[in-house]
């Protein structure tokens, strides 16, 4: 074996064994050459390809540095026809980012099948953090409309991504992907989405202007015909809705305004409401065109038997508890947690991320799919300190212990590659956001339902064995599902009320407007502290009902500019939000009892429920009298 072959063998052996120290030693002794970095092992892999497959970030970083120093080209193909970037798109997001940041990286390099790295990225990348590497691709000038041998674009490939397909499709469309590029069989991404049976994907592609009349040469079917064949009534109806609009636009010569109609969601059943204001929103300025559109939409309205549009109503449905997922057991690190019943440890490949819902100090929240169910996925930030791990375990412990229809359902946790909590998705958002939506009519019936379900959720926690104190109860932490049911959530600050947790419970937590006075004075946080928070939520609900719009607690006190001022005033001056004058005395009394400065005087959740039922019966016996108390404030009043 020659010295060059010996060096090459030593390098490949060290990389295969993830021995970074050995590679550094070889480098320091000048035993790694440019040819070593561009050579292949018996399986046709380069040293960098091996490091990428091993997902070893430190090794990849080291080899990339050596490529720069020795001027080795990382864009060359291995014996399997793949470049380093083709391989990197299947790696951890940090590793992919590092390869993309390499100065001379070729993002459009094609393999034997003419697939570019972004083809594979769109199909195989798993992390919900797909936006950052995608933007690097864009900055490097990637061709998002590149076609492989079969004519497939990255958009076609994204349809097959089992983890982040909807997010990937969205990124592609926002960055110039042509929604109507077809394969050699004349099939568009819309054909692929219909076959997959994903109505959400179909909707996104249609809104982007997908051609509904494109006929595939293999089966001689349009996407609409495929949907009919699949027997998917909802998808068929959706595609027909777009097809009818496109046909109408073509018939009257308005095709060039298709995107404007789609953006404003002006379909055939809405065209009768066309107005000058809507045309302004659509950006249609030509006087002649505006007159023609108004004339044709008016004619259409006269032809149709129009159904009167009604404001959004809150519909009562029979409540059904969520299904309990299969249990796969606990990992060793969580097995010793006390009070934990059955819980599911979820593999990351069982999840599909569909939409980013928000971000906070603890991480990001995505909407997604788990075993066909729509879920919320809380992806926690990287946890490197033992304190952060302990906080995760405590929330995991609480979530795993509770099984109640009044508490957001916990499906399980993902432990790698990132810590995630997988929960029931409540599509209407928080109770705060529901109350803050002025288009919703929240009368007394809805107020009582929201109040009773909130208290039942907290009662469930307080009656658990051992009892659980929420500690961060507020309208933002009460979620509303599509059936308008309240679900208690966010147990990041919650604790079992046991001896070992007393010291932790003393620490001030939660939002100050909902915080009980005893917490300010450093006393033990108890179930009665949660009851104080319930009082503020009852105040929010009653005020929203009577005034017809949401008012923030303590917003009437203009001198209180900061949250900490609120807790000082509530504790030292016994300040409370102002209850509306029109509020029935029975509700006034209940709210005041719940936020009594002396925690011993506050009722239990069971007592609150009993009183709420009595008050609701009082309302039902005097519905007109109670409804007369609702006098909405002017919309422009602060």
Curated annotation (Swiss-Prot):
Annotated ATP binding sites = 357-365, 378
Is Transferase set as a keyword in this record?
A: yes
The catalysed reaction is:
L-seryl-[protein] + ATP = O-phospho-L-seryl-[protein] + ADP + H(+); L-threonyl-[protein] + ATP = O-phospho-L-threonyl-[protein] + ADP + H(+)
Q: Does the keyword Iron-sulfur apply?
A: no
EC code(s) of this entry: 2.7.11.1
Q: List, alphabetically, the InterPro entries matched.
A: Ankyrin_rpt, Ankyrin_rpt-contain_sf, Kinase-like_dom_sf, Prot_kinase_dom, Protein_kinase_ATP_BS, SAM, SAM/pointed_sf, Ser-Thr/Tyr_kinase_cat_dom
Extract the SMART domains matched here: ANK (SM00248), S_TKc (SM00220), SAM (SM00454)
Q: Which GO terms describe its cellular component?
A: actin cytoskeleton; cytoplasm
Q: What is its main location?
A: cytoplasm
Outline the ANK repeats, range by range.
43-72, 80-109, 113-146, 150-181, 185-214, 219-248
Molecular function terms in GO for this entry? actin binding; ATP binding; protein kinase activity; protein serine kinase activity; protein serine/threonine kinase activity
Residue ranges of every copy of the SAM domain listed in the record: 240-303
Q: What is the effect of changing residue 378 to A?
A: Loss of kinase activity
Give the Gene3D superfamilies listed for this entry. Ankyrin repeat-containing domain, Phosphorylase Kinase, domain 1, Transcription Factor, Ets-1, Transferase(Phosphotransferase) domain 1
Entry-linked CDD domains: SAM_superfamily, STKc_MAP3K-like
Q: Which stretches make up the Protein kinase domain? A: 351-620
**Keywords, ordered alphabetically:** Actin-binding, ANK repeat, ATP-binding, Cytoplasm, Cytoskeleton, Kinase, Nucleotide-binding, Phosphoprotein, Repeat, Serine/threonine-protein kinase, Transferase
Which residues are annotated as active site? 472 (proton acceptor)
Pfam name, any one: SAM_1
Modifications made to the protein after synthesis: Autophosphorylated.
Main role?
May be involved in cortical F-actin organization and resistance to osmotic stress. Activated upon cell detachment, in vitro.
Please name the PANTHER family in this protein's record: MITOGEN-ACTIVATED PROTEIN KINASE KINASE KINASE 20, SERINE/THREONINE-PROTEIN KINASE TNNI3K-RELATED
The protein's name is Stress-activated protein kinase alpha
User: From which organism does this entry originate?
Assistant: Dictyostelium discoideum (Social amoeba)
């Amino acid at each position: 074996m020659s010295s060059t072959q010996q060096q090459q063998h030593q390098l490949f052996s060290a990389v295969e064994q993830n021995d970074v120290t050995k590679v550094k030693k070889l480098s320091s002794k000048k035993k790694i050459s440019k040819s070593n970095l561009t050579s292949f092992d018996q399986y046709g892999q380069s040293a960098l390809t091996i490091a990428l497959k091993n997902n070893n970030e430190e090794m990849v970083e080291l080899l990339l540095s050596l490529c720069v120093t020795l001027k080795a080209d990382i864009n060359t193909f291995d014996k399997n026809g793949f470049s380093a970037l083709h391989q990197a798109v299947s790696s951890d997001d940090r590793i992919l980012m590092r390869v993309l940041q390499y100065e001379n990286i070729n993002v459009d390099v094609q393999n034997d099948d003419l697939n570019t790295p972004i083809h594979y990225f769109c199909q195989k990348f798993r992390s919900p953090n797909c936006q950052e590497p995608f933007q690097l691709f864009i900055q490097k000038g990637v061709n998002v409309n590149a076609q492989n041998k079969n004519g497939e674009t990255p958009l076609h490939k994204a349809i097959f991504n089992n983890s982040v397909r909807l997010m990937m499709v969205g990124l592609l469309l926002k960055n110039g992907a042509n929604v109507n590029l077809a394969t050699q069989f004349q099939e568009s991404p819309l054909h692929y989405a219909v076959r997959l049976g994903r109505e959400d994907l179909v909707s996104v592609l249609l809104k982007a202007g997908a051609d509904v009349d494109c006929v595939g040469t293999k089966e001689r079917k349009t996407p609409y015909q495929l949907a009919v064949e699949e027997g998917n009534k909802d998808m068929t109806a959706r595609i027909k809705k777009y097809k009818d609009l496109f046909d109408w636009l073509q018939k009257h010569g308005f095709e060039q305004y298709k995107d404007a109609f789609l953006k404003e969601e002006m379909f055939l059943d809405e065209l009768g409401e066309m107005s000058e204001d809507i045309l302004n929103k659509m950006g249609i300025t030509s006087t002649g065109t505006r007159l023609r559109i108004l004339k044709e939409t008016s004619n259409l309205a006269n032809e149709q038997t129009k159904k009167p549009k009604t404001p959004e109503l809150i519909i009562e449905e029979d409540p059904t508890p969520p299904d309990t997922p299969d249990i796969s057991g606990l990992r060793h690190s969580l097995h010793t947690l006390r009070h934990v019943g059955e819980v599911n440890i979820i593999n990351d490949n069982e999840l599909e991320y569909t939409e980013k819902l928000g971000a906070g100090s603890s991480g990001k929240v995505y909407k997604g799919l788990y075993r066909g169910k729509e879920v919320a996925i809380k992806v926690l930030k990287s946890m490197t300190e033992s304190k952060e791990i302990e906080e995760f375990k405590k929330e995991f412990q609480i979530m795993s212990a509770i099984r109640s229809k009044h508490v957001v359902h916990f499906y399980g946790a993902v432990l790698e590659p990132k810590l995630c909590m997988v929960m029931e998705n409540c599509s209407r958002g928080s109770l705060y956001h529901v109350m803050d939506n002025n288009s919703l009519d929240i009368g007394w019936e809805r107020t009582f339902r929201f109040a009773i379900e909130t208290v039942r959720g907290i009662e469930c926690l307080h009656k658990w064995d051992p009892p659980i104190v929420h500690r961060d109860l507020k309208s933002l932490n009460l979620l509303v599902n599509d059936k308008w049911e309240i679900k208690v959530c966010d147990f990041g600050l919650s604790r079992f009320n046991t001896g070992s947790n007393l010291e932790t419970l003393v620490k001030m937590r939660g939002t100050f407007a909902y915080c009980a006075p005893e917490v300010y004075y450093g006393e033990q946080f108890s179930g009665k502290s949660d009851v104080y928070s319930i009082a503020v939520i009852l105040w929010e609900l009653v005020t929203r009902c009577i005034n017809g719009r949401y008012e923030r607690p303590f917003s009437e006190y203009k001198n209180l500019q900061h949250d900490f001022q609120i807790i000082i005033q509530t504790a030292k001056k016994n300040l409370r939000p102002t209850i509306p004058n029109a509020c029935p005395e029975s509700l006034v009394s209940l709210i005041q009892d719940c936020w009594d400065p002396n925690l011993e005087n506050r009722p239990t959740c069971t007592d609150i429920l009993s009183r709420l039922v009595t008050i609701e019966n009082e309302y039902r016996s005097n519905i007109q009298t109670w409804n007369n108390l609702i006098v909405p404030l002017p919309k422009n009043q602060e």
